Structure formats: C-alpha cells, structure tokens
Amino acid sequence: MSIPSGTEPQIKRFSVTADPDTIFQAYQEDGVVIIQGFLSPEQLDKFNREVNPRLAHQRQGYQPSLKARLMEGSLSALLPPQQKRVHNLAGFSKVFRHDILNHGLMHELCRRAFAATGDYWLSSGAVIENGPGTPEQGWHRDQPSYPVIQAGPGTAEGMVNFFTALTDFTAEAGATQFMHGSHKVVGIPDGDPNHPMLIAEMKAGDSVLLSGKLVHRGGLNNTSDFFRRALSLAISPCVLTPYESSIHLSRPLVESMTPLAQRMIAWRSASIPPPYQIGMWTLNMNEVGEEMGLKYNQPYDEDEE
C-alpha cells in the first residue's frame, strides 16, 4: 500500500502511563513506538552514574573484556573505535537489577509481543555510547535470519528491543533511523518511497520499542563533542532454550570436563555462522569460560558425586 502524498508518517509517541493495549496496537501497525519517560529522572541519573566509570575506563584505552585474548568472532573486535559498550549490567548496576528488569510497562508489552511463544527473557543488556565521528551503520534487522528461526511478516516475534536514550537523541548526533513499515516486507526496501526513513529523536529517559523485523541503523554522530548514549534492552522468547539447566553443577565437576563438553552444557560460549558470525552466550563480549577463568580437563574425584 502506497503512502499518500503529503502524509509523511511519524513514529507514534506515548507516555509511560498510557494504556498498554493502545501502545501495543501502534507497535504492531508500525513496528516501532516511542515511550516517553520510560526511565524516571532519578533512575536515569543513578544508572548513568553507575555506568560512567566503566565507559571512562574504556575511553582511556582499556578493553571491556577482562582477558587479553578475545574469542574469534567477538563483537568487540567489530566495533568502530568511537563506539564503546558496557555489558554485564546486572553484575554492577542496582538500577538495572531492581528497576529496569522489573519495569512494569516493559513486561506488559513483552507479554503481548510473545503471547504466541510463552515466556521471554533478556537476550542482551548493554550500554552503547557513540562518540563524535561514530560512522553510520548499515541497514539491518536485529532478528537473525537463519532458516530454523526465520520469521517474516505476519509471524511471531523473535526479538524486541527497548532502545532507551540515556542522553538526548538528535539527528545530528546519530539518532536511530528506521525504514517505516519494513517489518511487514521481506528484504531491505532501501530507497522505496513507501518505506521512508524516520528518525527517533528523543529526550533522555525515553525509549524506542522496535520489532526485531524492523530495518534500522544508527546514524552518523556528526558532532564534535557529544557522546550519544543508549541502553539496548533486547528481549527474546525462550522457545529454543535447552530443556535442562546445568547451572547447578559444581565448578570442580565442570572443570573436569573438556571445553567441548562444557559448551554442551552451556558453560562455554557458542558461535554462529555468517552473516552475523559473532559469539553467543558471552560475557563482556568474550568467551564466557575465559572471562570466568574456567579450567578444563582437571582431576576430579568421581567418588564424591
């Protein structure tokens, strides 16, 4: 369906206190909505103060990983030098643990988005800071397109993201850009007048909720001194999670196993093939076992089991 002349679409905006059904209906129609005041001023201030030292540490030249060696396919190695990312938010942020992960409206919308597949959980929580000169991203979707999980228009959601502004988002500083209606088509409709580009300019504390099927990109930070900061809160359904959990196993027992066996019970990271080809189940964008100092092939008294 073509867009009538003179009716340029806009990203719909809602207060954090708005009716969840109304917000979700707009989200289904457009693949994206802006929630104003998603974080309160107090939450925003406290969270930024929790994150500041870690970003400053990286700006001084330190890597987010605790280890010198990065796993093959580490996301860290793919980032432009102007961009810094902080992961493992639950490990140090009280606001993240107690406020953000319990956000009432976030859960109301997630329950609706994943109604067809059941429970959902955090896929990735990261603070992303784009400094001056951070280049424009290529157009992409967040939802992977591998055949086993490929979901096109009209199918269940494979991922949603509450992409929350921790500083003001302006076009000049590279505010996120979207292809209107692209969650309803196959492919990337670049240059299609029926899918014009929209820019999510926001105030700090606002959040843009986007479908994993929506084509988008981060814009060029064309400022000389502004660091655009965001919280990426990616949520995914639990349907491809292993049936059995091995989180209860003792570390000495796990360290008696080979790295391959450790990966089979989710004590090691995994990799996926191109076009994404990044590590999965990681810590600080690196191999989780390496970050934890996990040993392998260690002696173990089997009689203690």
Curated annotation (Swiss-Prot):
Superkingdom: Eukaryota
Residues reported in the UniProt entry to bind Fe cation: 140, 142, 216
Signal peptide: none
EC assignment: 1.14.11.-
GO molecular function: dioxygenase activity; metal ion binding
Cofactor names: Fe cation
Record's keyword annotation contains RNA-binding: no
Annotated GO biological process: biosynthetic process
PANTHER family named among the record's database cross-references: MULTIFUNCTIONAL DIOXYGENASE AUSE (PTHR20883:SF19), PHYTANOYL-COA DIOXYGENASE DOMAIN CONTAINING 1 (PTHR20883)
Protein family according to the UniProt entry: Belongs to the PhyH family.
Function: Dioxygenase; part of the gene cluster that mediates the biosynthesis of hancockiamides, an unusual new family of N-cinnamoylated piperazines. The NRPS hkm10 and the NmrA-like reductase hkm9 are proposed to convert two molecules of L-Phe to the intermediary piperazine called xenocockiamide A. Xenocockiamide A is then converted to hancockiamide D via a series of hydroxylations and O-methylations.
The protein's name in its UniProt record: Dioxygenase hkm4
Originating species: Aspergillus hancockii
